């Protein structure tokens, strides 16, 4: 190795040490049991428990195929994130990786788009809580916004506790969700095998063929549905954020990621196939969990209510996770200058409380939306959440590609956990994410208006950058500099000036 190569390698190592310094203050308290369940629970939320009812109405049995396609690409994204985590675990997750491989402007865009995702997702979750509460007739007269505010208060308080307690609560939240799905799969399979009629219909595959087949509304509605189904997997990347507070991320994260793909297949695809073989797909309704519909049709007292409690837990779990992620992402951005400096503050419990409080303020807007337009909140904010998650996943893939390039050039150590089939699968995933945006444009009116809002989001991001660039320049002036590679005539890495 030449002296120039050695110097460049040392400079990259110094840069990573500077980035790792941003992790100071966190308490590495998460164990394998908690990380495993967080990864599983992150893939099971309101997108399955609440969203599946409306999706079955729109696409029928084809929803199973849509879940399978989205689940496969979600796995690719997780494997790409796994590469980055093994390279350098960080609570800032892909925002920190964007800072390392793409510069602070990219970290700024990645961070704020991810914040948009979780801000919108949180509004969806508190809306879901309110809808679930209205399942019980006794609460029918209570305004939707009251339940939304109550959920926000409970989960906001929970997130101010130390990470060990957050992880433990999230473990039990996730366990309840998993047990609920497993219970449905077992009961549904036994009932299907018994041949007993349900709600006046004999169960079986004929419920698909006799009700319009696999694509009852044609192929296009199923394709357009992809942009909504993406939201169902919008928490899977949380394992990357949690890696910064794991006891042993090098071992725990790969195990957690590899467990996700078959569970997506079982929980999502298996559940939908079973649902449409137990009842006609038209029996499921928007606004009510299809699992609640099934158990209610069984006629067993209180089963529907029990399942409704489970889906309430799922919504609270997702809201809890969102506050966890945004607090840490906003702190990472503040450390790089892309967010206000006060968001870098930590409590004595090692919690980035300032970022969490900032997110709670946004969630209050969601409560107000529940007061103004309670019937449309879920669909309105769902598309904006999808925009944020698509951007975030794209940054993960691009950073993974840049990491591979750095490894090939000897500027980073190789990792043992890799995305299979890369770079082909990397490019294929980016193409899939682009196609989701195109499909969203056909989802009139909400999806069309959301895509039309992209230029406005872009303008706001540009304005915001001009507001933070001076602080970014000040912070990055103290960062180690990687000099220009004169032989290759390209910039290997150089901290970005705020131009």
From Swiss-Prot:
Entries under Gene3D superfamilies matching the protein: Amino acid/polyamine transporter I
A GO biological-process term: amino acid transport
Annotated InterPro entries: AA-permease/SLC12A_dom, Amino_acid_permease_CS
Keywords: Amino-acid transport, Cell inner membrane, Cell membrane, Membrane, Transmembrane, Transmembrane helix, Transport
Transmembrane segment boundaries: 34-54, 58-78, 109-129, 146-166, 171-191, 219-239, 264-284, 298-318, 353-373, 378-398, 422-442, 448-468
Topological category with respect to the lipid bilayer: Multi-pass membrane protein
Claim: Transcription is one of the keywords in the record: no
Any Gene Ontology CC annotation: plasma membrane
Subcellular location: Cell inner membrane
Broad class of where this protein is predominantly found: membrane
UniProt record similarity statement: Belongs to the amino acid-polyamine-organocation (APC) superfamily. Amino acid transporter (AAT) (TC 2.A.3.1) family.
NCBIfam families: PRK15049.1
Annotated PANTHER family: GABA PERMEASE (PTHR43495), L-ASPARAGINE PERMEASE (PTHR43495:SF1)
Annotated protein name in UniProt: L-asparagine permease
Gene field: ansP
């Amino acid at each position: 190795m030449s002296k120039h190569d050695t110097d460049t390698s040392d400079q990259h190592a110094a840069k990573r040490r500077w980035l790792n310094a941003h992790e100071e203050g966190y308490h590495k308290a998460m164990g394998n049991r908690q990380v495993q369940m967080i990864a599983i629970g992150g893939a099971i939320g309101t997108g399955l428990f609440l969203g599946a009812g409306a999706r079955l109405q729109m696409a029928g049995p084809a929803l199973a195929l849509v879940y399978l396609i989205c689940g496969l690409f979600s796995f690719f994204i997780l494997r790409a994130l796994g590469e980055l985590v093994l390279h350098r675990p960080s609570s800032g997750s892909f925002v920190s990786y964007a800072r390392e491989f793409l510069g602070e402007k990219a970290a700024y865009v990645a961070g704020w788009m991810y914040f948009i995702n979780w801000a919108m997702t949180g509004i969806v979750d508190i809306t879901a809580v309110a809808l679930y509460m209205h399942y019980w007739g006794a609460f029918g007269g209570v305004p939707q916004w009251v339940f939304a505010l109550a959920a926000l208060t409970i989960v906001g308080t929970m997130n101010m506790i130390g990470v060990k307690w957050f992880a433990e609560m999230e473990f039990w939240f996730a366990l309840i969700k998993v047990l609920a799905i497993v219970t449905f799969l077992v009961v549904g399979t036994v009932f299907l095998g018994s041949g007993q009629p349900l709600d006046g219909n004999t169960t079986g595959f004929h419920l698909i063929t006799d009700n319009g087949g696999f694509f009852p509304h044609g192929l296009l509605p199923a394709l357009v549905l992809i942009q909504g189904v993406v939201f169902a997997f919008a928490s899977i990347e949380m394992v990357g954020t949690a890696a910064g507070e794991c006891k042993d991320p090098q071992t725990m994260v790969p195990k957690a990621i590899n467990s996700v793909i078959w569970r997506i297949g079982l929980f999502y695809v298996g559940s939908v196939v079973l649902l449409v073989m137990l009842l006609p797909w038209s029996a499921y309704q928007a606004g009510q969990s299809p699992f609640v519909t099934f158990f209610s049709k069984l006629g067993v007292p209180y089963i529907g209510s029990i399942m409704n409690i489970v889906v309430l837990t799922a919504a609270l779990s997702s809201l809890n996770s969102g506050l966890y992620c945004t607090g840490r992402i906003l702190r990472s951005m503040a450390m790089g200058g892309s967010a206000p400096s006060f968001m870098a503050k930590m409590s004595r419990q090692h919690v980035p409380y300032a970022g969490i409080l900032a997110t709670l303020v946004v969630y209050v807007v969601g409560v107000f939306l529940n007061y103004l337009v309670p019937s449309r909140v879920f669909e309105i904010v769902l598309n904006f959440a999808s925009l944020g998650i698509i951007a975030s996943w794209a940054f993960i893939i691009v950073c993974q590609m840049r990491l591979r390039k750095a490894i090939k050039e000897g500027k980073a150590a190789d990792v043992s956990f890799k995305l299979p089939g890369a770079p082909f699968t990397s490019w294929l995933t980016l193409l899939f994410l682009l196609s989701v945006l195109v499909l969203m444009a056909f989802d009139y009116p909400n999806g069309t208006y959301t895509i039309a809002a992209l230029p406005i989001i872009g303008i706001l991001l540009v304005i915001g950058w001009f507001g933070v660039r001076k602080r970014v320049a000040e912070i990055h002036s103290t960062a180690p500099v990687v000099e220009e590679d004169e032989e290759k005539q390209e910039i290997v890495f150089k901290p970005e000036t705020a131009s």
